[in-house]
Amino acid sequence: MTMVYANIFLAFIMSLMGLLMYRSHLMSSLLCLEGMMLSLFVMMTVTILNNHFTLASMTPIILLVFAACEAALGLSLLVMVSNTYGTDYVQNLNLLQC
């Protein structure tokens, strides 16, 4: 494993640890999820470029599309929770039952 892969893997692990440690606020959870998606995108792009996988060159773009959808849904949920309850605590999400 080269240093590039080790650093990207370390960024993913740090984002995962941040998600597990700072899960009380929705905004910090969303930022950690975005960090995880960004490190996955960079890891996939570097792997595809190093191994010359021409057939899998669209895979990082598809991952970015899913990351953008996840960010849009997360931010809309954040706006809804903060407008309704005034805070962005994750524990307020249990109250959003229909």
UniProtKB/Swiss-Prot annotation:
Its EC number is 7.1.1.2. Core subunit of the mitochondrial membrane respiratory chain NADH dehydrogenase (Complex I) which catalyzes electron transfer from NADH through the respiratory chain, using ubiquinone as an electron acceptor. Part of the enzyme membrane arm which is embedded in the lipid bilayer and involved in proton translocation. One of its GO terms (biological process) is ATP synthesis coupled electron transport. GO terms for cellular component: mitochondrial inner membrane; respiratory chain complex I. InterPro entries: NADH_UbQ_OxRdtase_chain4L/K (IPR001133), NUOK/Mnh_C1-like (IPR039428). It comes from Mirounga leonina. The chain crosses the membrane at residues 1-21, 29-49, 61-81. It is found in: Mitochondrion inner membrane. It catalyses: a ubiquinone + NADH + 5 H(+)(in) = a ubiquinol + NAD(+) + 4 H(+)(out). It is a multi-pass membrane protein. Signal peptide: none annotated. This is NADH-ubiquinone oxidoreductase chain 4L. Coiled coil: none annotated. Core subunit of respiratory chain NADH dehydrogenase (Complex I) which is composed of 45 different subunits. The keyword Electron transport applies. Gene3D superfamilies: 1.10.287.3510. Keywords: Electron transport, Membrane, Mitochondrion, Mitochondrion inner membrane, NAD, Respiratory chain, Translocase, Transmembrane, Transmembrane helix, Transport, Ubiquinone. GO terms for molecular function: NADH dehydrogenase (ubiquinone) activity. Belongs to the complex I subunit 4L family. It is an enzyme of class 7 (translocase). It holds the Pfam family Oxidored_q2.
